[in-house]
Amino acid sequence: MKIVVYHAEECDRKKCTSLKLGRKGKFKIVSSLNQLPRGALVLNPFSEKAVSPEDRDMVLRRGIAALDCSWKKVKKSSVIFQTARNHRSLPFLVAANPTNYGKPCILSTAEAVAATLYIVGLKDIASDIMSYFKWGPHFLDLNRELLEAYSRAENSLEVVEIQKKFIGG
Ligand SMILES: C[S@@+](CC[C@H](N)C(=O)[O-])C[C@H]1O[C@@H](n2cnc3c(N)ncnc32)[C@H](O)[C@@H]1O
């Protein structure tokens, strides 16, 4: 499984989830956009299209790419979000990492990648990624009902419908 993270060097390196997974050999950390895998699913919080089980083949064959930068600095115009295709945002999920605990959609890179893997049906790999953090398994437990529902959707539109019903109560 190719998981490649473009690292913008804006974070506290001790707290950075992608650098930790890079050290464990789970993520490849790159500093040049040319090193991102072609055709990968790009995790972009500004994308209008949501991750769905339809993306499974793309994830298996091409991998996942993410941008690790400060949430304070991330912008629609961030360079990685301009260059690649196949951008996806994650539907409503709540962060469990200590920096943004309880905040919807403001996920760490590790949480975003694990959620993507879960939704496309690669649940064991999602659990493995989360197992490197004390709070990681809690992220999956906290969001289990929604992650399960998203993982049973047909496509991105259905994922958005599930999200709407959940937020609307
Ligand atoms: C802004 S960085 C923050 C990383 C943080 N410093 C850490 O240690 O994990 C998080 C990245 O994860 C992905 N991500 C997080 N939440 C997302 C969402 N709701 N939709 C799509 N991608 C998301 C994006 O690639 C985003 O740039």
Curated annotation (Swiss-Prot):
Cited function: Aminocarboxypropyltransferase that catalyzes the aminocarboxypropyl transfer on pseudouridine corresponding to position 914 in M.jannaschii 16S rRNA. It constitutes the last step in biosynthesis of the hypermodified N1-methyl-N3-(3-amino-3-carboxypropyl) pseudouridine (m1acp3-Psi).
Q: Catalytic activity, per the record?
A: an N(1)-methylpseudouridine in rRNA + S-adenosyl-L-methionine = N(1)-methyl-N(3)-[(3S)-3-amino-3-carboxypropyl]pseudouridine in rRNA + S-methyl-5'-thioadenosine + H(+)
Which protein family is named in the record?
Belongs to the TDD superfamily. TSR3 family.
Q: Does the keyword Transferase apply?
A: yes
Q: Name one GO biological process term.
A: enzyme-directed rRNA pseudouridine synthesis
Which residues make up the binding site for S-adenosyl-L-methionine? Answer: 17, 67, 90, 109
Which GO terms fall under molecular function for this chain's record?
A: 18S rRNA aminocarboxypropyltransferase activity; S-adenosyl-L-methionine binding
**What EC number(s) would the UniProt record show?**
2.5.1.157
Organism annotation? Methanothermobacter thermautotrophicus (strain ATCC 29096 / DSM 1053 / JCM 10044 / NBRC 100330 / Delta H) (Methanobacterium thermoautotrophicum)
Main subcellular location of this protein, as a coarse class: cytoplasm
Which named protein is this?
16S rRNA aminocarboxypropyltransferase
Transmembrane residue ranges: none
Q: Which GO terms describe its cellular component?
A: cytoplasm
- What UniProt keywords are attached to this protein's entry? Cytoplasm, Ribosome biogenesis, rRNA processing, S-adenosyl-L-methionine, Transferase
Which is a Pfam family this sequence falls into?
A: Ribo_biogen_C
Where in the cell does this protein reside?
A: Cytoplasm
Q: Would you say which domain of life the source belongs to?
A: Archaea
